[in-house]
Amino acid sequence: MHRVEVDGVPTWMPAARLLGPDFEAGSSPGCWHAALAPRDAADVEARLRGLGFGGRALEVRVTPPLGRALVRAARAVDARRRRDTTPGFTRAGARFDAEGRWSLTPEAIALEWGRFAVGCGVKRVADLGCGVGGNSLGFARAGLSVVAVERDAERLACARHNARLYGVEDRITFLLGDAVALATTCPADLFFCDPPWGEHWHRTAVSPEALSPLPALLELRAGRALWAKVPPSADLSTWSERLGASLTIEPVFGRAAGDQQRVKCLWVRCAGAAA
């Protein structure tokens, strides 16, 4: 058996989902440990390699050390597993641009967020920086009225096409322009923002202040709720200090067999009229 210790797990992270059911909390906050068979220990090391949450890199220690052949085999299995990922759009004919292919919120997750918004009493959503429309479609399919703002004309055309493909074009108003400039003109109970992270976002420290237009929208929300999709590595400590109990941070795991233990993003909710 190998003792596996993982340090740096945030308090808001469901550790059993991330690490597995055999892990127990250690004496220090964020520390977890388990006694695992060699293959299971190698699998955990492979899955967590290079990951960071809340602005801090995870530290994984395995004693006694794993053999090189076992490590290589586990990493090969993990690479194959990553190919089975939660799909973006599931209907044939959806349109993307290059950014949309890797930044699109999976369809199942976007629809869950839409239904959650309905349960919160939200009626109207402003999707500020809608991209190719994944989140807008999730809200619209849940029955909400959506204003989708995007500054890239090609991307906005993709979003409009995808809304038509899913039969919700009549629930979405599409606006070409700057999200910050148009935010306060949008009739909405909820601001939603999925800022561009960059395809190779830094895994150990991303400040929300660097995720434009999110900081500006926080100032402009004027009592509205603000939800955001941010990278798992985002350090939200300054927001936690500022917003206190009105801030909820929820890690979002994949829904497919290959990514069900992988955090796809953080769903950040700043309470307002739609708390």
Give the ranges of each region predicted by the language model.
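Conserved SAM-binding motif I beta-strand of class I
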Residues: 145-150
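S-adenosylmethionine
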Residues: 185-253, 260-264
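Core SAM-dependent methyltransferase catalytic element
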Residues: 255-275
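S-adenosyl-L-methionine
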Residues: 2-123, 152-186
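Conserved class I S-adenosyl-L-methionine
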Residues: 121-131
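Conserved SAM-binding loop of SAM-dependent methyltransferases across substrates and taxa
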Residues: 132-144
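Short, glycine/acidic-enriched loop or turn micro-motifs at the edges of active sites
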Residues: 130, 153, 181, 197, ...
